[in-house]
């Protein structure tokens, strides 16, 4: 709703500068600044009494003064503006734009204007003008249409008055389908054969392919953790569970109504006779056949899938963010500005279940004041950063890694570390209260801590209920810890959430009984302790300094991020526990003298 409101505001601004001004001096034959019956009398008298043609009285510019001019004037006195007409149909094949409209019958007609404006590129122009009243359609060749297009036709009369018809909204072509109450797709224009394997792209786009191969998009159908969740969801919700998962984790299977219920493991799916585009999970064509914007997934009480993708596969056109792409012998290329916007991450990265905002990374970004309207930092800036050669990284860097391999060996690990290091800052200061430089032994040490987000979505985000994010605080003397909160001995140790001083950013999903759950489809409520974009969280620790401490003490605070709470991994895939990383997002240290 908010996005639609923004669109309409922009539309009003664009329309406000597009109308022609009326010149009422034309037809005002008695010069009284009003079109009325006196002007009709003057025109009639001229036609009756004058033998010679007068251009002043020729309102339809046919070089004759006659009854037609009288009709035009009478019509305009009765109705101050030209007759309103409307665009009836628009068709586009990514080369030719065809527009048809109903014909004007206005007696004062001078010409049509077809006006075009685009929400994303903010283009606004008259794309066609015709002085023939009988024109009702036009074919515009090589017209590069974008997403979110608005058209309207206006009629201009002999006075220069302009009347605009209703706006006609036109999305780029995409293939349609319907979804039933169980989340199964039917009446689909999309087939499996419409999609190309990602390996087909490798020859020309080798670096993109290699990056994708190591990404979580590629991992979606190679993740034992995903299959554990899928099997549990399917067991508890046999009617809707399969498509609930595949609508995001395997969009091609979802869109082609390919049933994945029988495949309960990576091995069973990858060894099957299913097409490779389904085994790939989220391949190149899932994104690069997108032509229009999708919306957040809202799932009702049944849990049935209802993701709406707007794709145009199987037409040998690949869409992307490169303006004026070079021609090649393999496919047509088409530039769309949406590919640099956060909207491209819909529908998958925004899921609401029973009004519970379960996984809403896009919404978190969209709620930042001014971001979506005025072009804040898009998802791609951080998660698909531009490389030295001008192309963008297709590793889709995020918090998660392939748990099949040691995280230090994962080629994406350093990228994730760099991403985490750029997400938050911390300081020992809360509204001017700072750490002391000197303290007496036996006293209480007040440690003021401010954590500040410098990223454009919550921390944690996505499946935030799976993640552990917290502050580890240590106070040490001579390398011996005299106080700690959030300190773990290893990456697989469980956090002590009973520690009243633990500064945690944990999110919990609650089921219908109010118990915690990791099953998204069973979410009935949420406790969200995550850190909002560009927000701050404050904490003050009161720590007793023992009487026997002297010299210096060190205070260290670390913001830590574990992409998965280890209990689920230990219960389902214990062999992965050593591959579970903990990222250090930020660290600060201070030394205090003890007297």
Where are these regions (language model features)?
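Extracellular acidic, Ser/Thr/Pro-rich low-complexity tracts
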Residues: 48-49, 104-108, 157, 453, ...
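Short, surface-exposed loop/turn segments at beta-strand-coil junctions that are enriched for proline
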Residues: 143, 544-550
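Primarily the internal scaffold of c-type cytochrome electron-transfer domains
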Residues: 175-192, 209-236, 261-516, 520-522, ...
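Cellulosome-associated attachment modules in secreted, modular CAZymes
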Residues: 19-86, 106
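Sec-dependent N-terminal signal peptides
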Residues: 4-20
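Pro/Thr/Ser/Gly-rich low-complexity, intrinsically disordered linker/stalk tracts
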Residues: 81-108, 145, 158-177
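Recognizes extended acidic, P/S/T-rich segments that occur
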Residues: 111-146, 158-165
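Hydrophobic beta-strand segments within extracellular beta-sandwich modules
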Residues: 151-153, 555
């Amino acid at each position: 709703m908010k996005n639609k409101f923004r669109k309409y505001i922009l539309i009003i601004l664009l329309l406000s500068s597009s109308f022609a001004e009326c010149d009422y001096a034309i037809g005002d034959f008695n010069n009284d600044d009003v079109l009325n019956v006196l002007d009709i009398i003057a025109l009639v008298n001229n036609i009756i009494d004058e033998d010679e043609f007068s251009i002043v009285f020729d309102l339809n510019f046919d070089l004759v003064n006659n009854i037609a001019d009288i009709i035009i004037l009478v019509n305009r006195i009765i109705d101050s503006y030209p007759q309103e007409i409307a665009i009836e149909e628009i068709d586009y094949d990514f080369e030719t734009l065809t527009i048809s409209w109903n014909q004007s019958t206005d007696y004062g007609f001078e010409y049509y204007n077809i006006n075009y404006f685009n929400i994303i590129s903010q283009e606004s122009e008259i794309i066609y003008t015709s002085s023939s009243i009988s024109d009702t359609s036009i074919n515009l060749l090589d017209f590069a249409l974008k997403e979110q297009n608005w058209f309207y036709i206006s009629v201009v009369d002999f006075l220069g008055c302009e009347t605009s018809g209703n706006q006609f909204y036109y999305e780029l072509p995409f293939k349609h389908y319907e979804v039933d109450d169980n989340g199964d797709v039917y009446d689909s224009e999309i087939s499996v054969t419409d999609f190309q394997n990602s390996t087909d792209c490798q020859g020309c786009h080798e670096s993109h392919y290699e990056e994708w191969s190591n990404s979580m998009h590629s991992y979606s159908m190679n993740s034992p953790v995903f299959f554990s969740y899928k099997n549990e969801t399917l067991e508890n919700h046999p009617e809707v569970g399969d498509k609930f998962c595949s609508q995001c984790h395997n969009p091609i299977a979802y869109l082609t109504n390919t049933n994945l219920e029988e495949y309960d493991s990576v091995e069973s799916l990858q060894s099957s006779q299913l097409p490779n585009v389904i085994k790939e999970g989220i391949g190149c064509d899932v994104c690069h056949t997108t032509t229009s914007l999708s919306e957040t997934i809202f799932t009702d009480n049944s849990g049935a899938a209802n993701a709406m993708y707007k794709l145009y596969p199987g037409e040998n056109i690949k869409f992307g963010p490169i303006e004026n792409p070079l021609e090649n012998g393999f496919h047509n290329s088409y530039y769309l500005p949406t590919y640099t916007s956060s909207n491209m991450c819909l529908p998958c990265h925004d899921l609401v279940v029973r009004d519970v905002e379960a996984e809403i990374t896009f919404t978190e970004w969209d709620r930042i004041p001014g971001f979506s309207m005025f072009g804040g930092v898009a998802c791609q800036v951080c998660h698909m950063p531009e490389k030295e050669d001008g192309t963008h990284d297709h590793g889709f860097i995020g918090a998660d890694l392939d748990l099949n391999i040691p995280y230090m060996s994962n080629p994406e690990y350093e990228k994730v570390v760099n991403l985490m290091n750029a997400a938050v800052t911390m300081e020992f200061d809360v509204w001017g209260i700072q750490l002391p430089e000197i303290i007496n032994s036996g006293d209480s040490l007040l440690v003021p801590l401010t954590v500040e987000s410098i990223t454009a979505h919550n921390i944690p985000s996505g499946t935030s209920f799976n993640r552990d994010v917290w502050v580890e605080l240590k106070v040490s003397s001579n390398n011996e810890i005299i106080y700690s909160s959030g300190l773990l001995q290893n990456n697989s140790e469980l956090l002590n959430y009973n520690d009243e001083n633990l500064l945690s950013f944990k999110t919990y999903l609650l089921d219908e009984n109010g118990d915690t759950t990791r099953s998204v489809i069973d979410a009935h409520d949420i406790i969200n302790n995550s850190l909002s974009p560009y927000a701050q969280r404050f904490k003050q620790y009161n720590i007793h300094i023992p009487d026997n401490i002297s010299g210096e003490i060190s205070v260290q605070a670390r913001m830590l991020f574990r992409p998965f709470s280890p209990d689920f991994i230990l219960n389902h895939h214990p062999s992965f526990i050593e591959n579970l990383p903990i990222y250090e997002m930020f660290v600060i240290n201070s030394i205090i003298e003890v007297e």
